[in-house]
Regions:
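Positively charged, low-complexity terminal tracts
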Residues: 1-86
């Protein structure tokens, strides 16, 4: 089983700071789930591609505990920058 959950193509209008800074790399990301591994355990699949280089990025195959850790880290980072978190 493979199923796409969400994706976000980079939009330079949403973040012109990243778009205009040659030292920053704009990326697109996608989240999916898959269970076609040798152990048949479902994993969260995070793909990050540099703009203009589709298929050349990194793909993380995360067990549920790893995905929860990233979720907690994102929540904490949002809190640190003053964003409301659920």
């Amino acid at each position: 089983m493979r199923r796409s959950i969400d994706d976000h193509p980079f939009d330079p209008l949403q973040d012109p700071v990243v778009a205009d800074d040659p030292d920053l790399t704009p990326v697109s990301w996608a989240i999916a789930i898959a269970d076609d591994y040798d152990d048949a355990e479902p994993r969260v699949v995070l793909t990050v591609d540099e703009i203009g280089k589709p298929g050349e990025g990194l793909v993380a195959h995360l067990l549920p505990a790893e995905a929860r850790r990233i979720r907690a880290a994102l929540r904490d980072a949002l809190r640190e920058v003053g964003e409301a978190v659920e």
